[in-house]
Amino acid sequence: MKLDKKIIEVNNLKKSYGDIEAVKGIDFYVDEGSLFAFLGLNGAGKSTTIDMLCTFLKADSGKIKIDDFEVNKDDDKIKSLIGVVFQDSVLDDLLTVKENLKVRSKFYNMSKADFNKNLEEIAYVTGIKDFLNRQYGKLSGGQRRRVDIARALINKPKILFLDEPTTGLDPKSRKSVWDMIRRLQEENNMTVFLTTHYMEEAAKADYIIIMNEGKIEAKGTTYELKEKYAKDKMIIYTKNNTFFMHYLSC
């Protein structure tokens, strides 16, 4: 994986809701083709940041560049480059999977031929081919999440934003979705920007930022963060501490 271009650049980004400072002047960048994770508890400012990056929410101040395009100046171009998976699905329970994806393709003025071509590729890579003609509302949680990701991929974006993509899923479904995300990123050199409150999910990323109360508390690779903050220790419980300590001192 070649990481030589900053596809997302954020400088001194701020956002408040009344007296509440949701994002407090953060700075970071994301390398093209990387899997990037925002880790933090609910209310840390992760979703607000994603909404600003995706042009859904206007920042109070600061600067955002997506693939060299500036948010608030080049929003239409930026929207054509990104796909977004929200915490809550935006698809119609009463429509089939294929119908939902076709509706989404209309946002990009996609021709029927292009839609069918993209659908075939996306259905294969996301594993939704077997239930394309089933109603979205009748799918399992894991299947629905796969369709949500397929919706975000219909325009073949350069950057995929995933806001808490596995929340509410059982461990097996979470693993399945994660395997798919990693495969998409590695095989297509796609940049994946993830928010999560699961430590084990963030640990799979190439680079991690830990947010708390609107601020960046720590950042680095998994290895760098472990080296700096984690202390390895072994706890041994014994029935006879005196006997055990004798052998430790030998």
Language-model features, listed with the residues they occupy:
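Conserved ABC ATPase "signature" region
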Residues: 102, 106, 113-131
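Catalytic Walker B motif of ABC-type/P-loop ATPase nucleotide-binding domains
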Residues: 160-163
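Conserved catalytic motifs of ABC-family nucleotide-binding domains
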Residues: 156
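Conserved ABC ATPase signature
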Residues: 135-139
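Conserved ABC transporter NBD signature motif
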Residues: 62-73, 77-78
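ABC ATPase "signature
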Residues: 219-220
